[in-house]
Amino acid sequence: MMILKIGGSVITDKSAYRTARTYAIRSIVKVLSGIEDLVCVVHGGGSFGHIKAMEFGLPGPKNPRSSIGYSIVHRDMENLDLMVIDAMIEMGMRPISVPISALRYDGRFDYTPLIRYIDAGFVPVSYGDVYIKDEHSYGIYSGDDIMADMAELLKPDVAVFLTDVDGIYSKDPKRNPDAVLLRDIDTNITFDRVQNDVTGGIGKKFESMVKMKSSVKNGVYLINGNHPERIGDIGKESFIGTVIR
């Protein structure tokens, strides 16, 4: 069983509002369509989520301006999600959109609808999104957060994160030409020893992956989504990426 997250930096131009990389979406989905044990897909927002969230003060207190922003961010994320869903349907897959904003009940997320879709043979697709945190504030639940929840609920064999880098390095490869790609990381390592922030968020992602490992049987993988065919090399000597065991 595999769960997989497509990073927003892979399928959007993060510097240009609501600009999708449609070729990347199609190439990734083409690979995903051949994975029989893929049970859940999550994707980030990139320029469909972050830009307007920052502009309207999300996450943050509930007020007239942030409420408008809430609607805009959710609409934009739905539009990006529809592109992913359309590509999956075109490849013969059975996706079903399950927005995280609709799963919030009594201060927690209830994934019962998502699990039911998996049991029925569908591939649920969720994404980082806004949600009503309480009567006074709005929150944002990231794709990484959803992946952590899915790992705990489903106990998959493999969890995969597709990003715009080849993996986690020993040092920042942009500043250190001698940086080495860490192909296999023991969970006892600390990020202080992995002096890398090649995307501006690898540190946080690394921590999320380490926390997930206890719920994933055969490793949490970080793979360059611009080369989705590398998913097929998981477990092989030729694999390029990072696995946390």
Curated annotation (Swiss-Prot):
Q: Which GO terms describe its cellular component?
A: cytosol
**Matching SUPFAM superfamilies, A to Z?**
Carbamate kinase-like (SSF53633)
- Record note on pH: Optimum pH is 6.5-8.5.
Under which name does UniProt file this protein? Isopentenyl phosphate kinase
Q: Which UniProt keywords apply?
A: ATP-binding, Isoprene biosynthesis, Kinase, Nucleotide-binding, Transferase
Q: Where is ATP annotated to bind?
A: 5-9, 46, 164, 169-174, 201, 205
User: What is known about its subunit structure?
Assistant: Homodimer.
Q: Which family does it belong to?
A: Belongs to the isopentenyl phosphate kinase family.
**Where substrate is bound, by residue?**
45, 50, 143
Function according to Swiss-Prot or TrEMBL: Catalyzes the formation of isopentenyl diphosphate (IPP), the building block of all isoprenoids. Has lower activity with isopentenyl thiolophosphate (ISP). Has low activity with dimethylallyl phosphate (DMAP), 1-butyl phosphate (BP) and 3-buten-1-yl phosphate (BEP). Has no significant activity with geranyl phosphate (in vitro).
Instruction: Please name the CDD domains in this protein's record.
Output: AAK_FomA-like
Residues of the site described as Transition state stabilizer: 14
User: Could you say which enzyme class this protein belongs to?
Assistant: transferase
